[in-house]
Amino acid sequence: MISYEYCDSSDSFYFNDIQDFDFNPWIEVKSVSEKGRCVFSKKFIPKGTMVFRDIPYAAIVDNQFKRNICTTCFKILLESNRHNFQTCPSCFQVNYCSNYCKQYSKIETKHTELECKWIQDFTVSFKHQMAEDDRNIVLLVLKILARRIHEKQSTIFHNKPLTTNTFETCTSNNNNIDLLPMIPNDIPDLIDHLDDYFINSKNNNEFENEEEEEEEQEQKGEGEQEENENNENNEKVKKKVIIIDDNEKEKEEIKKFNKIWKNDFKRLINIAKVIQIIIDDSIDSLENIKCDYGFVDNQGDTEMVDNSIDPKGLDKLVDNLSSSDLNILRLLCKIRANYFGLWNSAYKPIPLNSIDDDDDDNNNNKEKPNNDYLWCGSGVYLKLSLFNHSCFPNCTTLIEYNINKKNSNNNNGNNGNNNSYGDTNQLTISIITLRDIEENQELLITYIPLNQKINDRVKSLKSNWLFQCDCKRCHFEKINENQTEKIYKDSCCTNQKCSGGLLIPLEQNSTQGICRVCKNTYTLPTVFYPLK
């Protein structure tokens, strides 16, 4: 999922107590057939309205930016404030902009002793073997597990097996998404796609067997037809060609994504096994333990996985999953399906090896940010996970540490006592309406970058979230790819050097919108046909 920044004054929005769905004046959660939990408007909502806020359950700075961003406040580590930098003396993988942030760290970013130990083990034994995205999701899962153990919470995410059959266990009614509470208040309440992966793995094999039988029957039928064909029959066959071609395209599409999902499933199983090894106290040494699939070799090259073919050994991996493996795999799938990206201004990153005080070439943030944003971290937000996706969303997400960036940057020289935040959680994400929303209309955000063609958007959503987008933009672009181009571009920043995306209303009912990146303002469109 993608979350965006908003670097204007927080006075643009009225901060109601809107963190509780039960008392929220604007929105409510409903269950919709074939979609599950959705967020709908209780009444008419003007554009530019802040309708919801949520704090993360856990959040991390991504591995490649760990020397650039404070773990607590997610503020850029400015070179002028280097004398205040703090680093964990044990794992050397967690950094703070000040001693205050190190001590002030809230539970969602708190670096516990257990997490520190796990990070050390992961760094020594596995990190160099894994791709960047996989490293980050492992770190996020480890932080969640460490928090739950620190708070003496349950670490059971997968229901106890009712049978020795792994497939039956994972697809049993006890793991049915219909049994999840309407409002997620804990990690186990989050939806995951583990059952879908298991079902696809099983049904994919059956699908291929049925396809082979159909091909044999077709070949047999073609042989008989060749013996008895005549001109009249040939004409009938020609009329069916278009229908047959459409069916073949649909089958090929299903086969393609089945193989993508199976390869992804194997990767997730192996990541879960890595996590299980790290947290297993019974293993004395993690040296010489090798990752098995899609990881980085000794030369630093990522293994190329061909998603167009079935992965080898998946059936054996599934059959050998223990109850502990299933539990971690369930947690991993919940996190992967629900985490939000935390974005920040694009600065020159510090090299990951070390920082040389005398080497000015390695100094960070001497340059001004360019008109771009970087995915610099990840967070799990329990209630924000209820908002569904659209390729032309009527809402956007804004991060608190960017709303208050001006104030926080003025406190870099405060001898490391950056207490300007007070009780405000800098990782709070707010939902802002981009357009007027009618009563009983679903509120939607985006999970992906929107400046992509429909085929790329479909592939991204089906590969990562296992669903076919049926939003109006996709519907009309299937008919004519250019049909929605004008209204989409009219709703975005027109600065060619900017990647800001959809404009955000300056305030409630405003006719002007601001670009989240370059800060230019434009007149907002009033006609959204055919997407309204």
Swiss-Prot record:
Transmembrane segments: none annotated. Its EC number is 2.1.1.-. Signal peptide: none annotated. It comes from the Eukaryota. It is an enzyme of class 2 (transferase). Residues 199-240 form a coiled coil. Residues 207-217 have a biased composition (Acidic residues). GO terms for biological process: methylation; regulation of sorocarp spore cell differentiation. This is SET and MYND domain-containing protein DDB_G0288495. Belongs to the class V-like SAM-binding methyltransferase superfamily. CDD domains: SET_SMYD (cd20071). PROSITE patterns: SET, ZF_MYND_1. InterPro entries: H3K4_H4K5_MeTrfase, SET_dom, SET_dom_sf, Znf_MYND. GO terms for cellular component: nucleus. It comes from Dictyostelium discoideum (Social amoeba).
